[in-house]
Curated annotation (Swiss-Prot):
Substrate binds at residues 106, 138, 169, 248. NAD(+) binds at residues 29-57, 99, 138. It catalyses: (S)-lactate + NAD(+) = pyruvate + NADH + H(+). One of its GO terms (cellular component) is cytosol. It is found in: Cytoplasm. This is L-lactate dehydrogenase A chain.
Length: 332
């Protein structure tokens, strides 16, 4: 008899059941690992799987997380180069791909990352045909479209992390100006995750009090308080962090875990995330952009119809045109 047999009397032989709340993260770079640790700290999964092509780094990251098991409540953390390890995932988060260099626009990454997606997405679909796909790799709006096209999934199950982070950055900066916690500062950034994102000034409020009603010049060039700068800071923030530390990781990791929580717990919270927007706001092409979406365990179930000012609507259309111009040239 082994020590284990001396210690433990077996009552019931457990069949190897699948995990019920499995999350897989594809790509164990700085962003993938920030997503992983944020998800682990929120106890969202009963199994977390990591996938990457660099096997030593992958195994090292897995071991490093496993060594923290005592402090976590996710009983199984595994990894592998082969996508069979991702089988039966509820949620698959894709962070893999080339990342922005200093001064490089997100749109510049596109063809490199499309080629990577041509390998990743079919493998994910093969092993988890019923999963929700959450795309984080940049340019996120275009790659969410690419993932939707390659996967053959219905639109509601292919989600881009989109402007969830841009809106969080906006609310943080707004809070800094007003001396109020970002949770109590309400404001939405929609459109492209990146340089052509659109701040919806008409909806910015604290406790339901419209800031634009109190300060009509808000967000315009005539504004003495230069609130437009807040949006400029949001657009510049990734570039600034990349310039200073080489990459961004923590904020996007927390933002993705926020979305994962809404999905895994079926919270039906509204998030500014990337979805198919054809037919909305005068957009005629098959593009994915961030709009306020109701998110839950089946993916995106509804879109909130924003009331936009004509100039805001115009900016969203321009965003869509920019993306379509790139999308229609893509080879996949």
């Amino acid at each position: 008899m082994s020590l284990k047999d001396h210690l433990i009397h077996n009552v019931h032989k457990e069949e190897h059941a699948h995990a019920h709340n499995k999350i897989s993260v594809v790509g164990v770079g700085a962003v993938g690992m920030a997503c992983a640790i944020s998800i682990l700290m929120k106890d969202l999964a009963d199994e977390l799987t990591l996938v990457d092509v660099v096997e030593d780094k992958l195994k090292g990251e897995m071991l490093d997380l496993q060594h923290g098991s005592l402090f976590l409540k996710t009983p199984k953390i595994i990894s592998g180069k082969d996508y069979s390890v991702t089988a039966h995932s509820k949620l698959v988060i894709v962070t893999a791909g080339a990342r922005q260099q200093e001064g490089e626009s997100r749109l510049n990454l596109v063809q490199r990352n499309v080629n990577i997606f041509k390998f990743i997405i079919p493998n994910v679909v093969k092993y988890s045909p019923d999963c929700k796909l959450l795309i984080v790799s940049n340019p996120v709006d275009i790659l969410t479209y690419v993932a939707w096209k390659i996967s053959g999934f219905p639109k509601h199950r292919v989600i881009g992390s989109g402007c969830n982070l841009d809106s969080a950055r906006f609310r943080h900066l707004m809070g800094e100006r007003l001396g109020i916690h970002p949770l109590s500062c309400h404001g939405w950034i929609v459109g492209e995750h990146g340089d052509s994102s659109v701040p919806v000034w008409s909806g910015v409020n604290v406790a339901g009090v419209s800031l634009k009603a109190l300060h009509p010049d808000m967000g315009t060039d005539a504004d003495k308080e230069h609130w437009k700068e807040v949006h400029k800071q949001v657009v510049d923030s990734a570039y600034e962090v990349i310039k200073l530390k080489g990459y961004t990781s923590w904020a996007i990791g927390l933002s993705v875990a926020d979305l994962a929580e809404t999905i895994m717990k079926n919270l039906r919270r509204v998030h500014p995330i990337s979805t198919a927007v054809k037919g909305m706001h005068g957009i005629k092409d098959d593009v994915f952009l961030s709009v306020p979406c109701v998110l839950g365990s089946s993916g995106i179930t509804d879109v909130v119809k924003m009331i936009l000012k004509p100039d805001e609507e115009e900016k969203i259309k321009k965003s869509a045109d920019t993306l379509w111009g790139i999308q229609k040239e893509l080879q996949f």
